[in-house]
Curated annotation (Swiss-Prot):
Residues 154-343 form the CheB-type methylesterase domain. It catalyses: [protein]-L-glutamate 5-O-methyl ester + H2O = L-glutamyl-[protein] + methanol + H(+); L-glutaminyl-[protein] + H2O = L-glutamyl-[protein] + NH4(+). This is Protein-glutamate methylesterase/protein-glutamine glutaminase 2. The gene is cheB2. Contains a C-terminal catalytic domain, and an N-terminal region which modulates catalytic activity. GO terms for biological process: chemotaxis. Belongs to the CheB family.
Amino acid sequence: MSKIKVLVVDDSAIVRKIFTEELSKYPDIEVVGSAPDPFVARDKIVHLKPDVITLDIEMPRMDGLTFLKKLMRHYPLPAIIVSSLTPKGGKLTLEAMDIGAVDAIAKPGSSYSVGDMSGQLVEKIRAASGARVVRKSTQEMFQPGSRLSIRSLAETSNKVIAIGASTGGTEALKNVLSRMPPDSPGILVVQHMPANFTTAFAERLNSLCQIGVKEAADNDSVTPGTALIAPGNYHMILRRSGARYYVQIKMGPMVHHQRPAVDVLFKSTAKYAGANAIGVILTGMGADGAAGLLEMKQMGAGTIAQNEKSCIVYGMPKEAVKIGAVDKIVHLDSIADEIVRMV
């Protein structure tokens, strides 16, 4: 089996050394080179032909975003963004996702060890090596589809929509949520993403959608017309008190090497919302969410999976389909319509 060839692009010699040493421990990965800036990276990409690059977002001579735009236009290949755990880093990372990056990881630091980073980075590289890279124009803007409507707020106030995504999910979620009508049932979202990145992600979605979108806080009510995004590094659990749905935000052990984990949300939704829920699993690597979606279906919830053609990585939906957890397999552009039909 051929190895996955990786090029590390980072202005920090320390980060280049750490990434090279850590990735070299895995027999299926070969670090074919490293580059301190985009100009060196450009030449190495042409000559070394890597399968995946890791790309620092903030570099001298040419910043990572500018380089990524050029890369996607002339030599598109899977890029994993490496960014600091800061609000600025989160916003830049989301811009990179818009341009065409397939995933992101936080730089190792005081609260995020090399060991934590290593395992996650390897999984992201493996997923990225098989990702479908979408070539985008630098002027391309996402255009929402037709505006949907739901019959009445009263009919939907006891419904809950739970959505899970990983690699490629930032763009997929933008597609789905921007098409949801303002009278949608309450929506809960788990996107595999580091802490601080989710704050910027929620703010960005809120500016694009008819519904309100916010990063979830402990004890937030689940209300019609609002989507709650699980904060990075915390699980989000649905609870119910009488007629009120609310979320619990807590640490807890990682599930499928993830926190937040989709399975944690889906299993709690199965327990507390039952047949009043709709579960949606979008593009992403691994199997997170499959077991939880099956529990939702067994409790009477409607379940939807993104189809292979429209996925960046057909991993999580594939696993859900494989175990019989899915009612409808739908192209990304039709998922919002399918949710409305199920409501």
